Design a protein with these regions (language model features):
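A surface-exposed partner-binding patch
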Residues: 1-145
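Short, solvent-exposed coil/turn segments at beta-strand boundaries
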Residues: 132-135, 151-157
């Protein structure tokens, strides 16, 4: 199943780059030397660049990062799909359309960002335990700040979750299928 998630991510990023090219869009991010990323394109000089911004592209990682520290800290086994989802690429968060709803996939910008993600994931899992709800792993944000898209750690399904209340609906049987259904959209600056 993890190979299917990798393949779906590769195809999704290819679709993103195709949309960017077709729409003559340049992905860019405000440059902060203290928040560097392997995604930044060195010496990017493009007429579309905003002042203080630098062009970037998603970068495939050499190896998938591990969530073993979370598993050890919380005595939980995480669905292996989540390590592939967050550990295959470095990228800015990616806007996409799913069933005509605009969402934003949470992605990892750098190794430091991966550490921050792990801290947030631990806090999320601890909150789920406190609320006596099944463990979920967030993967995307929604327009409604009280909703997230998450991976159900028990079933492996992709679900919509209302924060504090739990799972409200199943969106896809697994992460690969969910990613395959995404349509890239241009981010708003």
């Amino acid at each position: 199943m993890t190979a299917a998630v990798t393949d779906a991510l590769i195809a999704f990023y290819a679709r993103c780059e195709q949309v960017w090219h077709t729409q003559d869009y340049l992905p860019q991010q405000e440059f902060d030397p203290e928040w560097d990323s392997p995604c930044f394109i060195a010496d990017s000089n493009h007429p579309q660049l905003l002042a203080g911004h630098q062009a970037w592209l998603p970068v495939r990682r050499n190896e998938v990062s591990s969530f073993s520290n979370i598993e050890a800290a919380l005595s939980i086994e995480l669905d292996p799909q989540i390590a592939v989802f967050f550990g295959t690429y470095f990228s800015d968060h990616m806007p996409a359309s799913f069933n005509d709803e605009i969402i934003e996939l949470v992605q990892v910008w750098s190794e430091d960002d991966f550490k921050r993600l792990q801290e947030n994931m631990i806090a999320h899992l601890m909150m789920k335990k406190t609320l006596k709800q099944p463990p979920t792993l967030f993967i995307a944000s929604c327009a409604d700040d009280m909703q997230i898209i998450a991976l159900d750690n028990i079933s492996g399904e992709v679900v919509r979750e209302v924060l504090g209340k739990g799972i409200s609906e199943v969106l896809a049987p697994d992460l690969a299928y969910f990613i395959e259904q995404l349509t890239p959209v241009l981010p708003t600056l």
